[in-house]
Amino acid sequence: ISAVRNFSSNSSVKPKIILHVAQLQNSDWWANGVTSQAGVTDFDILGLSHYFLWSTVNKNTDITKTISDLTTKYKKKVMIVETAYPWTSQSADGYNNIISGQNAVDGYPVTKEGQLKYMTDLTQAMISGGGVGMIYWEPCWITSNLKDQWNTGSSWENNTFFDFTGKPLPVIKYMKHRYTF
């Protein structure tokens, strides 16, 4: 944090400092530990990962309340800085997908339209709670010839903004949706 602040003092660039925690159910406990116990308060934004598969906070009303409570309690801006939702249960390669179509959230089928609805509703829930931004995790991580120690391809290509041929999916529209502020 001090390195960023030192850089900012001598630059026209003023980066924001985000502290990032995984999953909404951990956010208050973690932020309390960081601020009250460790005394770290010099940051601008509390960043949250939200993956429905690993979260116990999945109802939009609960997401809104969690973000609102964090904003009020810690007097910091809050963003969802990692999220994703699958558009298909299929795979374009032999690499097992991390999030499969069998893990759908009620009301959000694992389809192109379901992915768009999920992202639109999640973004509105975040905004309704006072959140200031949404970042989608790896929207371009389509299959490729990339080989890692586990396999060749992508374990995420069913969560991207592009189909298996590279064509943009409807989910991109969530960024231009008219939200209620």
How would you label these PLM feature ranges?
Residues I1-V4, G33-V34, D62-L70, Y118, ...:
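A general structural detector for well-ordered alpha-helical segments in enzyme core domains, enriched
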Residues N10, V34-D42, D69-K73, I127-S128:
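Acidic (Asp/Glu)-rich catalytic clusters
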